[in-house]
């Protein structure tokens, strides 16, 4: 049963999202990946967000570029934690997505990571920190990773 739902706004985001997937696997976190667009498939975004908790998902990760509405759209339909990964998809090189992800109204938060691959990996590490509060094997995997970072 997936603990994390990874949602990308377009199939063209797959290369960056693969960094998230690889990191979730490293952290021993079960996940699922979906392509859903806040603009092209808003009803499917709503349905996914509303059903996520009953399906066992505990954290949502949303990767989107441009107006990056996906994270906010998901957060508007659920009280699960939503982590946003802004992606560079226009001449603005991700600044538009970064600001859109970060500037959520009070009460509908989206945790905003860095633009691109660093943000993609940190989204998974942040999910590990959240899930590690409840699951010892995830906490231990993340702590081991951090130990290895110190020893480099």
Range-by-range predicted roles:
Residues 2-40:
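Glycine-rich phosphate/diphosphate-binding loop of Rossmann-like nucleotide-binding domains
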Residues 33-53:
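N-terminal beta-loop-helix "entrance" segment that forms/cooperates
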Residues 8-15, 19, 94-152:
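C-terminal binding/interaction regions
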Residues 11, 36-38, 65-66, 87-90, ...:
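Short, ordered loop/turn segments at secondary-structure junctions
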Residues 2-3, 28-32, 79-80, 103-113:
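Glycine/charged-rich beta-loop-alpha catalytic/anionic-binding loops adjacent to active sites
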Residues 13-17, 42-45, 64-73, 92-95, ...:
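Short glycine/serine/threonine-rich phosphate/pyrophosphate-binding segments
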Residues 48-90:
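Glycine-rich phosphate-binding loop
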Residues 20-26, 49-50, 77-79, 128-130:
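Short, solvent-exposed amphipathic alpha-helical segments in soluble enzyme
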């Amino acid at each position: 049963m997936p603990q994390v739902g990874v949602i990308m706004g377009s199939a063209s985001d797959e290369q960056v999202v693969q960094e998230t997937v690889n990191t979730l696997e490293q952290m021993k976190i079960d996940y699922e990946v979906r392509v859903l667009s806040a603009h092209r498939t808003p009803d499917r975004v709503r349905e996914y967000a509303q059903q996520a908790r009953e399906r066992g998902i505990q954290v949502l990760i949303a990767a989107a570029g441009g107006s990056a509405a996906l994270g906010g759209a998901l957060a508007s339909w659920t009280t699960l934690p939503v982590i946003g990964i802004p992606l560079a998809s226009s001449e603005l090189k991700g600044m538009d997505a970064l600001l859109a992800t970060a500037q959520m109204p009070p009460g509908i938060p989206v945790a905003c990571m860095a633009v691109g691959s660093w943000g993609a990996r940190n989204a998974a590490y942040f999910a590990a920190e959240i899930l590690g509060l409840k699951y010892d094997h995830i906490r231990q995997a993340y702590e081991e990773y951090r130990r290895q970072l110190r020893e480099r």
